[in-house]
């Protein structure tokens, strides 16, 4: 299930990397023309993806767009080693990581136009759809993040902790 989720997230992120509006935004350094709310709403309605976050980062490591907050314009590459790696290598990266908000699946795909590197698009998905699939098979999963990450998770998506272990799936019982 994890590999399937990563592959699906990667495929969706690749599709976004081909978006002409996205490429124009990056060429003109104008994140205001990017809006993926309809895409996210459609995926929530028509797929198991219920909580998708999208971030667009220019070639200099500056966030032009985030779907889950209005914050943008910061040099995200200063604090995200994975972003630094992709900006340098210009190759896609798939990972599972724990950050400020949650334990997530992250896919970062480089964006090119006429072989010119413009930046990256990142899709972040969560463990809830996997938990839902397991529940449908009468398995009650609890995805825990080690308590050593408690101070790092400053805006927890689920807001649920058990003995300082963060619970990453909303439907944990």
Language-model region placement:
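A conserved mid-domain beta-alpha-beta active-site/ligand-binding segment of alpha/beta enzyme cores
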Residues: 169-173
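A short beta-strand signature within small-molecule sensing/ligand-binding domains used
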Residues: 101-110
